[in-house]
């Protein structure tokens, strides 16, 4: 840091500087503007991490790599142009840049690492040039305002066929990232797989139709879609179904509910379901109550994680496997109602600070001591 200074909110980076080192301006909350000289070829890891007042940065065409977490948490940054000289955008490079409304990824960029633009909640559209041949996991996760995704024609690895507002891995027909809008999405019938977190936190999304050719859905593919009120799996799908109009995706062979909705509430879980899968209702923020039927024997980790409006849970006697974090961060829970002979059992499977919530069916709402 001795090499650089900040004057009147502007980072002073001398001509002739070859790189901006790791952590160079880490946490400099007074920094508002960065002008990088053309001698710089690399922006180091966490170079501008936590520069929460940074509103403007000009990245010259000399830069070849933007390091991991380079602009992490730069929550005042509104636009950025990635020049054609940049080959790699590092992991979490612009993660948490919540005011970022415009990103230009120039032809020449080859790799966008995992979570590079995660949580850019003001971003509305993305254009992926044909030079980009590697996109990491959850690159645009948490981009809740995203309404348009386009992959340039001629990209050898990815496409956005049928104007689907999504990024699809061409060779595998895997949908790796979708949009919040239009609110009712159309997944192309040629898609066979939906990647983990593909629609995570698409908060405007209200309905989903899963074509019969989709035979693989990654964990938390629709987590945090808190406006989602309708999920339908096309008849004839060999792996999944939405039996009994349940507004959920069920793995047919195992009777495992892998994705549910926030609404209607209370939700109705079919009596044929035997397991609530990992993260099945994670981020269903509008869900207020749930009844777990007698058929359910297993509730997996984070099944109801972060259901912040959930108040009442009815658990049956049949649950023999309950992960301790199944209802983690359900901050408004008022009662977990269980059969009389199961009170002690459930207290063994919930964290100590939730024991006061566990009451017999038919009892008054508990009061925390």
Regions picked out by a protein language model, each given a short descriptive name:
Residues 324-325, 347-349:
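A short acidic (Asp/Glu
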Residues 1-19, 29-42, 52-65, 75-88, ...:
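Structural signature of tandem-repeat unit edges
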Residues 24-26, 282, 349-352:
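Surface-exposed repetitive/solenoidal architectures
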């Amino acid at each position: 840091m001795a090499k650089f200074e900040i004057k009147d909110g502007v980072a002073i980076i001398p001509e002739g500087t070859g790189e901006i080192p790791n952590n160079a301006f880490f946490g400099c909350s007074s920094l508002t503007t960065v002008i990088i000289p053309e001698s710089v070829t690399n922006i180091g890891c966490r170079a501008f991490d936590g520069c929460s007042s940074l509103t403007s940065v000009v990245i010259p065409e000399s830069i070849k790599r933007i390091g991991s977490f380079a602009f992490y948490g730069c929550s005042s940054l509104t636009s950025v142009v990635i020049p054609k000289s940049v080959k790699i955008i590092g992991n979490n490079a612009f993660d948490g840049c919540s005011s970022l409304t415009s990103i230009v990824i120039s032809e020449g960029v080859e790799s966008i690492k995992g979570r590079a633009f995660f949580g850019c909640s003001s971003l509305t559209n993305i254009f992926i040039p044909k030079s980009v041949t590697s996109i990491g996991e959850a690159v645009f996760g948490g981009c809740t305002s995203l309404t348009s995704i386009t992959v340039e024609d001629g990209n050898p690895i990815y496409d956005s066929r049928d104007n689907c507002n999504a990024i699809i891995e061409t060779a595998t027909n895997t949908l790796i990232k979708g949009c919040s809008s239009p609110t009712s999405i159309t997944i192309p019938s040629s898609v066979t797989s939906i990647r983990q977190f593909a629609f995570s936190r698409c908060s405007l999304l209200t309905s989903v139709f899963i074509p019969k050719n989709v035979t693989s859905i990654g964990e938390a593919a629709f987590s945090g879609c808190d406006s989602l009120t309708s999920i339908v799996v096309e008849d004839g799908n060999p792996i999944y179904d939405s039996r009994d109009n349940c507004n959920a995706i069920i793995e047919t062979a195992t009777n495992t509910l892998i994705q549910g909705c926030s609404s209607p509430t209370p939700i109705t879980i079919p009596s044929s379901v035997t397991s609530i899968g990992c993260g099945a209702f994670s981020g269903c923020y509008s869900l207020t109550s749930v009844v777990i039927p007698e058929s359910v024997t297993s509730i997996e980790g984070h099944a109801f994680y972060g259901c912040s409006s959930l108040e009442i849970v009815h658990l049956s006697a049949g649950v023999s496997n309950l992960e301790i974090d199944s209802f983690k961060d359900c901050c408004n829970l008022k009662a977990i109602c269980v059969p009389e002979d199961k009170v002690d059992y459930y207290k063994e499977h919930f964290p100590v600070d939730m024991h006061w919530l566990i009451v017999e069916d038919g009892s008054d709402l508990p009061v925390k001591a």
